[in-house]
Amino acid sequence: MTDRQRGVALISVLLITALVTLIVSDMLARQRLNLISSANQSARQQLWQLALSGEAWARQQLLADLRDQQGLARVHLGQRWAQGPQEFEIEGGRIRIRLEDLGARFNLDRLRDGRDRFSHARYQRLLALLGLAPHDPARLSAPLGRDGKPLPFADASELWRLAALDAAGMRRLRPWVAATRDGGLNLNTAPAEQLASLEGLDMGIAQALVQARPADGYSSVQAFIEQPLLAGRKVEQYGLSVASERFRAVLDVALGEHRLRLVSDLLTRSDGQVQILRRRLAAPGLPFSE
């Protein structure tokens, strides 16, 4: 074999070795990616199962309140569901659960047909209290039901279609509104800002009303209207309530470096059951307390 032939053979061997090295490296890289993908998928499945466990716990709190002697005919902040955010360690992960009465928010569905002057005025006062530009959700186009009436809002996110609300405004407004069909504002759970949007009230009176609220809530809207703090003030009973049917569970789950937030809307039914109305994933919340 000549020197030229030996050189060609050596180059061929080097090329084959390089090719084999590239193939093996690619196989190892793909294997690592598959392992990472499998690990991430497994973590997501575990997070989802942990979130559902938290949702089941939230349902149990509402079920326990439903089965009490008075049930949830009166919904107030002294009940099990309102005990505040709860954190648990389970199966190597952590869950934070927060239950909220959606009846404590302004019900956007009361604005749908544009003829509800009390709700419209209250909404405008709420916007002013929050420092937001006035706007009218009734101007949004809505599909009609079989009865020819506008269907309820699917979600508060429909307000994105309003030109008066930018991203910052929507973030500001979102915690104060909900779409709860024909639900009224629950006087037993509503914060001062919601009460201050009622006729003839301001933040000073509203804060005093929150402080004076009975631990087990008002027995009726009339009992709220007749309290001494409202003497000489005319608050319309329309659209007000002392009970709620719709609640929201916000479930934050952590497993190692992985995070998940599940938001579940719940309905307490007259037959004593708690129904899951819908679930949605949201951006993970604040870190867990140490």
PLM features: what roles do these ranges have?
Residues 2-290:
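Compositionally biased linear targeting/interaction segments
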